[in-house]
Amino acid sequence: MAVSSAFVVTPKLEKLLANHHNPTYSSSPAPLDVIGIRALPMNNRNKRGLIQRARCEISPSNKAASISALEQLKTSAIDRYTKERSSIVVIGLSIHTAPVEMREKLAIPEAEWPRAIAELCGLNHIEEAAVLSTCNRMEIYVLALSQHRGVKEVTEWMSKTSGIPVSEICQHRFLLYNKDVTQHIFEVSAGLDSLVLGEGQILAQVKQVVKVGQGVNGFGRNISGLFKHAITVGKRVRTETNIAAGAVSVSSAAVELALMKLPESSHASSARMLVVGAGKMGKLVIKHLVAKGCTKMVVVNRSEEKVAAVRNEMPPGVEIIYKPLDEMLSCAAEADVVFTSTASETPLFLKEQVETLPPVRDARLFVDISVPRNVGSCVAEIDGTRVFNVDDLKEVVAANKEDRVRKAMDAQAIITDESKHFEAWRDSLETVPTIKKLRGYTERIIAAEIEKSLPKMGIDMNKKMRKTVDDLIRGIVNKLLHGPMQHLRCDGNDSRTLSETLDNMQALNRMYGLDAEILEEKIRAKVEKK
């Protein structure tokens, strides 16, 4: 968008321009001497800003040309922030890009999501944010004023909260922008990006992001709209492609893996099973064990309530024995297979504890599907002990994947269609600031003209007469604005109409100098937030 050269550079905007030309930023503009202004070093003692100092360097002989160049500089700097809208960005690490050792350090418990959103939105170039943290992925979704600076700030925030160096995060992270973000979250919600293709639990986790985000300031219109649309896509894909039919879940894959690793002389009905944790994942482990023929197992949990609820869902003949958490180690001493799926942020089984357990006939199996992990990595060093985590489930998943590849192709067609709808909706939001600013612009003119005209009328007008004059002026202005306003409204469904609407918006921004106001409002919001 072009910006009128007549706009006034206010202190906040001047500060932004000064920062924008600070050499510490990697996205620095072209050298100022190219346009006839000598670049001067920035320092904290001089608060008058780049533009003030540049103005002092204008020689009398080149004054006119330099002023023109200065206006170009102002305009180009503003353009950098207003020509393109804020970007939706995802900075993520998943089972496809990072090991569980890293993911568990970055994991953010659900109860901490609102705090994380608030901290992310406190960063200079972040307007909105959401966190999707599961056993297979840790992804930060943001609306960023600047792609490069937004990514830099979020990556540094991730490093600070996890203790992982920025360089290491950069080696394993993936970055996606705008349309690619839309494609990605839709694939995630549909189960296409899961280790277990088509699994349904991820859709519930995406729903939880929206549920937790409701009422959180930083979970704004763009990001919330993205996640809500992702839920719609996830439901549609599962309904129209039946991709979840026959799909294994992480829990069922864990059970399959355990049975694969049991010695030939053992099977589900004879092996002694222990399940630690009776949450969603633990409940599914129990159900899959029963489906495989296991009729007796011990379940360790903080409270008996959840275990009793699971027990009531089991068929006759299945014995589920509840044990409190403080008896976990003694229960493990009598188990051949230990499944762990709790929300604990520290390991429940450490090497020094497991070393004290009596040996079993072949090897004691620990199948840990928690992130952060419930079983310390050093436990695998103990003789007669084998440890598996979520990254080891790929062996099971590979055998189950082929028959759903075709359904995944059908799902991609749905995702492509829904992505177009979402991007069109987001494009239609672009005109909202212009509509608000144009309305505010006319309101200021109306108020100023009424105040200026009333004394000239030479009469003391009562409230009723004043309201009549006010309504008359507003009626005239509203009729004049009706046409422009109609040409700024679009639902985003028709690409041709949308393109025309955006052209109209840019024209009005140029005519009334609204770009600078819109930018200053963003800056003001950031300053007030801090």
From Swiss-Prot:
Pathway, per record: Porphyrin-containing compound metabolism; protoporphyrin-IX biosynthesis; 5-aminolevulinate from L-glutamyl-tRNA(Glu): step 1/2; Porphyrin-containing compound metabolism; chlorophyll biosynthesis
Catalysis performed (reactions): (S)-4-amino-5-oxopentanoate + tRNA(Glu) + NADP(+) = L-glutamyl-tRNA(Glu) + NADPH + H(+)
Site (Important for activity): 184
One GO term describing the cellular component: chloroplast
Description of the deletion phenotype: No visible phenotype, but decreased heme content in roots.
Protein keywords: Chlorophyll biosynthesis, Chloroplast, NADP, Oxidoreductase, Plastid, Porphyrin biosynthesis, Transit peptide
Main localization category: plastid
Main EC class the enzyme belongs to: oxidoreductase
Localization in the cell: Plastid, Chloroplast
GO MF annotation: an example: NADP binding
Residue positions of the active site: 135
Tissue expression notes: Expressed in roots and flowers. Detected in leaves, hypocotyls and cotyledons.
Family matches, as InterPro entries: 4pyrrol_synth_GluRdtase, 4pyrrol_synth_GluRdtase_dimer, 4pyrrol_synth_GluRdtase_N, GluRdtase_CS, GluRdtase_dimer_dom_sf, GluRdtase_N_sf, NAD(P)-bd_dom_sf, Shikm_DH/Glu-tRNA_Rdtase
One GO biological process term: tetrapyrrole biosynthetic process
Ligand binding (NADP(+)): 277-282
Induction description: Not regulated by light. Up-regulated locally by wounding and reactive oxygen species. Not regulated by methyl jasmonate.
CDD domains: NAD_bind_Glutamyl_tRNA_reduct (cd05213)
Transit peptide boundaries: 1-64
Pfam families in alphabetical order: GlutR_dimer, GlutR_N, Shikimate_DH
Keyword Nucleotide-binding among record annotations: no
Residues that coordinate or bind substrate: 134-137, 194, 199-201, 205
Role description: Catalyzes the NADPH-dependent reduction of glutamyl-tRNA(Glu) to glutamate 1-semialdehyde (GSA). Probably involved in wound-induced supply of heme to defensive hemoproteins outside plastids.
Family per record: Belongs to the glutamyl-tRNA reductase family.
NCBIfam families: hemA (TIGR01035)
Note in the entry: During catalysis, the active site Cys acts as a nucleophile attacking the alpha-carbonyl group of tRNA-bound glutamate with the formation of a thioester intermediate between enzyme and glutamate, and the concomitant release of tRNA(Glu). The thioester intermediate is finally reduced by direct hydride transfer from NADPH, to form the product GSA.
Identification of the protein by name: Glutamyl-tRNA reductase 2, chloroplastic
Phylogenetic lineage: Eukaryota, Viridiplantae, Streptophyta, Embryophyta, Tracheophyta
Name of the gene encoding the protein in the UniProt record: HEMA2
